[in-house]
């Protein structure tokens, strides 16, 4: 985390990892652009920027999206240097993505950036609530909140939070928690100038922008 050159805002670099199809990109687009995309646009890596207020202070959050597919395993670590916090994402309707947190994602993050705090995030909770057992394929067993907390303890993540990008349930809470963890780790957890002690979910006025490419992303790859 650092001061954004020329803006005076505090910079937070947030990296999101997890299996393909857990909804990482939709999560970032909904937070940064206040929009739930429906079109599929394949990408490997994308950056977004969102600015939030914390009292009188601007927090500029640089969001780094990564591909979860195995063929990008050698490229993905390029996203890690300079990270302040990591979101480890799994789908609450995918047992395999949940197990991959323990077997792949937490070990990978701990290898490349062992001192960076992480938050475990269970996505697609709107679909978890809609799922019903299929008598032809066996009983459907979604990932419960208790299972998420258990995994959080196993991998020593700072928090476990659940979210739906589509309904926005838990969306601001996830990113506000990430911001606060970073600020606390830098000794900036005291009350800010106007007495507020948490990052607001309301944009500070800057229109959120995407990082590398100049075009606004219109679609969502379910990474």
Curated annotation (Swiss-Prot):
Cellular location(s): Cell membrane
Protein name stated in the entry: Rho-related protein racE
GO CC term (a single one): cytoskeleton
Alphabetic keyword roster: Cell membrane, GTP-binding, Lipoprotein, Membrane, Methylation, Nucleotide-binding, Prenylation
Residue positions binding GTP: 18-25, 65-69, 123-126
Record propeptide residues: 221-223
Oligomer and partners: Interacts with rgaA.
GO terms for MF: GTP binding; GTPase activity; protein kinase binding; signaling adaptor activity
Modified positions (Cysteine methyl ester) in chain numbering: 220
A Pfam match: Ras
Motif (Effector region): 40-48
Gene transcribed to yield this protein: racE
The protein's role, per its UniProt record: Specifically required for cytokinesis.
